[in-house]
Amino acid sequence: MSQLLPQAYLTNFHNRIRNEDVPLFITAAPTRNHKRAKVVNYSEYDNDLLLDDFIEQDQNDDDEKVHSDNGKGEGEEVGHEDAVASNNNLPDLEQQDDPTGILRYPRIRETFLQSKIAVRYEQVLEAGVGGSGEAVGIAEDEGAGAYSSSSQPVVIPIRLNLEHNGHKIIDFFTWNLNDHSLTLEQFAQIYCQDLDFAHNLSLQNQIVAAINDQLQEYETLASVVVPDLHVIINLTCNLDSKLYEDNFEWNLNDQTLSPEQFAELVVQDLGLTREFMPAIAHALYESILKIKKDWLEGHLNPEHVANGAAFGCLSGIRLDIDTLGSNWCPKVEVLSQWEIEKREIEKERNMRRLKRESAKVDDRLARRRGKRRMDDLETTMRI
């Protein structure tokens, strides 16, 4: 070969998500069987010494392999070449010409050697159904006939929190109920392929069950069309060590601005990384579902919106001399994981407290109404 491999020919995604800085795929914390038992965290030890031991052991293994290969017969050597040729998942970079000299850097060469050959998703789905390709054709037909641009999307936020072989998979995304171009089983196949867990039926079944449970739970709630209702949304979203917090007014019946468009505008205005776009949209969808649930249960008063607007208007200018409207401005803070969890716990406590207070007010109003009705009834009977 006279040039490097073509672009996007190799993928190293399965190795990148195993990095400690990526919270998608993390190692589960060891549990203690006894309260006095000590949990050993091997990451606290000197990894350089362990790495030197592994390198020395690998060198010894390579020397033994060279001596054993020299003693092989012709038949064994041919069988070994056939086995290497059948391994299509690993790139062949040993015999590749490098005119630019980029592969002389150890980190770049290591990245190439640890990567896999990228496979089209159609081939992954065909391999999952035994190579017949029927599932792919059905999905394409359903997607062409069942989903169009005129159909209103019903989006449900999905969260995954699974454990598999000592690792935790924590992820979030959105699922459109009116888009039938991809089934849950096909999505699980592609998801496991990206994580380098191909043909793992147990993990695929866990993913399908987790998504299906959340779809059944929020399907009716997400399909409800509410009237012209203005609400206050206190949105918090954390990604890595950054915490985004905002307080704004949202009309649940206004379809001119979607959560995805709102997230894109926020990312552009605040100069955040594009990874915040799906995170903000997902958090906004979750907040909208919670508000819809409160509205259906009668815990939301549509006549009074605490937006702080001047002259009692639904929206507009806010007259705030003390803080100059700082409570209605977006904030981005760099916090530790413990501080972010503390903020989330405080937010949940405040939401539960406000819900209890609103329930008490509704109960008092109901009692007063009942008492007035009894007084009116007694007055009528006397007359």
UniProtKB/Swiss-Prot annotation:
Broad class of where this protein is predominantly found: nucleus
Start and end residues of each stretch annotated as Disordered: 61-80
One example GO MF annotation: nucleosome binding
Bias (Basic and acidic residues) ranges: 64-80
GO process annotations (BP): chromatin remodeling; chromatin remodeling at centromere; chromosome segregation; double-strand break repair; G2/M transition of mitotic cell cycle; nucleosome disassembly; regulation of nuclear cell cycle DNA replication; regulation of transcription by RNA polymerase II
InterPro entries given in the database record: Sfh1/SNF5, SNF5
Keywords for this protein: Cell cycle, Chromatin regulator, Nucleus, Transcription, Transcription regulation
Keyword presence, Cell cycle: yes
Entry keyword Cell cycle: yes
GO CC entries: nuclear chromosome; nucleus; RSC-type complex
Cellular location(s): Nucleus
Physiological role: Part of the chromatin structure-remodeling complex (RSC) which is involved in transcription regulation and nucleosome positioning. RSC is responsible for the transfer of a histone octamer from a nucleosome core particle to naked DNA. The reaction requires ATP and involves an activated RSC-nucleosome intermediate. Remodeling reaction also involves DNA translocation, DNA twist and conformational change.
Family as reported in the entry's similarity comment: Belongs to the SNF5 family.
Name of this chain's protein: Chromatin structure-remodeling complex subunit SFH1
Source organism (scientific name): Eremothecium gossypii (strain ATCC 10895 / CBS 109.51 / FGSC 9923 / NRRL Y-1056) (Yeast)
